[in-house]
Amino acid sequence: MSSKKMVNSVEGCADDALAGLVASNPDLQLLQGHRVALRSDLDTLKGRVALLSGGGSGHEPAHAGFIGKGMLTGVIAGSVFASPPVGSILAAIRAVAQAGTVGTLLIVKNYTGDRLNFGLAMEQAKAEGISVEMVIVEDDSAFTVLKKAGRRGLCGTVLIHKVAGALAEEGMGLEEITKRVSVIAKTMGTLGVSLSSCSVPGATHTFELAADEIELGLGIHGEAGVRRIKIAPVDQIVTLMLDHMTNTSNIFHVPVRSGSSVVLIVNNLGGLSFLELGIIADAAIRLLEGRGVKVARALVGTFMSALEMPGVSLTLMLVDEPVLKLIDAETTAKAWPHMAKVSVTGRKRIRAAPTEPPEAPEATAAGGVTSKQMALVLDRICTTLIGLEEHLNALDRAAGDGDCGSTHSRAAKAIQGWLKEGPSLTSPAQVLSRLSVLLLERMGGSSGALYGLFLTAAAQPLKAKTDLPTWSAAMDAGLESMQKYGKAAPGDRTMLDSLWAAAQEFQAWKSPGASLLPVLTKAVKSAEAAAEATKNMEAGAGRASYISSAQLDQPDPGAVAAAAIFRAILEVLQTQGA
């Protein structure tokens, strides 16, 4: 069975894709009757050398994405993974010649069909008196022994577009550009790796891999590589790739050694996420620098793809200052990244963290709660939440991803670790503020953010006083902040239901003569009743709000956890006779 693709038709997909690129880019025009894209300002290039490239479609943004001032003049596109026809290549050569250019350089990847078709078109154009030269790019470092067909042309071709484009923009002649580019093209190598193959529209995947395998040294047309290896951490995979590319026993190695300066391309072959691409880029830069290699520039993104192939290729080009100047030259090509003209290696990448503001003197524990009791309370809360881990996870599976208990347990263990450090617990405001930071950093998820908001706001009133009315005010402040940013309200089947119920009881602390334990006892009972009542509520916030109410027949785990926290506080204070 063929794979699914977003196309109008298999036959017309290459035409439609190029038409879409031109329609959305005012700097491009289609050549009538051909699958050719040209610069729309072609007539301004009189007296300059034109640069044409191309090949099969399916490698986007290559090659048409690199048309622009300072790069390509035009591109001839074939069908998916198929060389463009001779007639279209010749038409493109004629078009740029008739616009007044003084010669055309064809930049061609080393594939048999491309060499034949571009070569034939070049010979026909020369027979018509047009000045044309061709550079064949061979940057594949996968094969370790010489093959008759030579090396494949891969993502390094994009760097040749850039270098040649900069030289043409300087006004250099065709013969000199050809010589310079031919030399530079021999200083680079590319190696790819993929998690699976790709599929041409209307066809199945080109090869199959086991679930734990990846393909090393594959090409950009879905063809298999030189070796299959087991999936491993990115650092190991990138190390293997760099070792293979720079191994002197490999006839096609890149002569990179300590002290070398390189341009690095981390190229998405089509199906990798940006997250994965960033991880690979970090590994490649770090590992190259660890070998004493200076990474002068790093290009990270999609430059030459293989449809939806979930893989990456690494390209290394040895550079000196003159070549780097060509890489840095301005271009209007849409697919070329905007890069600072600053070396990657040697640049300061980490900014010092901001300093904590000096802490103002704050009120110490009052209201009958000592620092010793506070430590006992926190410890009991932690053991309670750890003990509830599986129960809370079970409740969460009906409406979430089943990790509510694990999230609370993780927070509890983080607090236990902090308590072992022997922190000062004399200032409730400082304790709540520190807990807020701890939960934001270690608890994670929405719960960590909500508790962080609650504790940060609750700490503010306690900076001045810590009597019972202020503890009630702290509860109010925490709930207000939680509602403001969490957008939940009482009755929405969240942890807020338990917290709100307790807060209503805490209002009694604002009355003269109120006692700690009687009010806290009532608050705990109200919180537990509110948590139990959530099983009859329709969720109005959180992930559970996307679940049918018919499926929600258990209490909300967040509300249960909040009620359990109040119960733990009460039990400790009762034991301590607060």
Swiss-Prot record:
DhaK and DhaL domains have differential roles, individually DhaK is inactive and DhaL displays cyclase but not kinase activity. This is Triokinase/FMN cyclase. Residues 9-336 form the DhaK domain. GO terms for molecular function: ATP binding; FAD-AMP lyase (cyclizing) activity; glycerone kinase activity; metal ion binding; triokinase activity. Its EC number is 2.7.1.28, 2.7.1.29, 4.6.1.15. The active site is at residue 221. ATP binds at residues 401-404, 446-447, 486, 494-495, 556-558. It comes from the Eukaryota. Residues 372-571 form the DhaL domain. One of its GO terms (biological process) is carbohydrate phosphorylation. Dihydroxyacetone binds at residues 56-59, 109, 114. Homodimer. Interacts with IFIH1 (via the CARD domains), the interaction is inhibited by viral infection. Belongs to the dihydroxyacetone kinase (DAK) family. SUPFAM superfamilies: DAK1/DegV-like, DhaL-like. Catalyzes both the phosphorylation of dihydroxyacetone and of glyceraldehyde, and the splitting of ribonucleoside diphosphate-X compounds among which FAD is the best substrate. Represses IFIH1-mediated cellular antiviral response. Its cofactor is Mg(2+); Mn(2+); Co(2+). It catalyses: dihydroxyacetone + ATP = dihydroxyacetone phosphate + ADP + H(+); D-glyceraldehyde + ATP = D-glyceraldehyde 3-phosphate + ADP + H(+); FAD = riboflavin cyclic-4',5'-phosphate + AMP + H(+). Keywords: ATP-binding, Cobalt, FAD, Flavoprotein, Kinase, Lyase, Magnesium, Manganese, Metal-binding, Multifunctional enzyme, Nucleotide-binding, Phosphoprotein, Transferase. The modification Phosphoserine is found at residues 511, 545. Coiled coil: none annotated. GO terms for cellular component: cytosol. Each activity is inhibited by the substrate(s) of the other. The keyword Kinase applies. Manganese or cobalt are requested for FAD-AMP lyase activity.
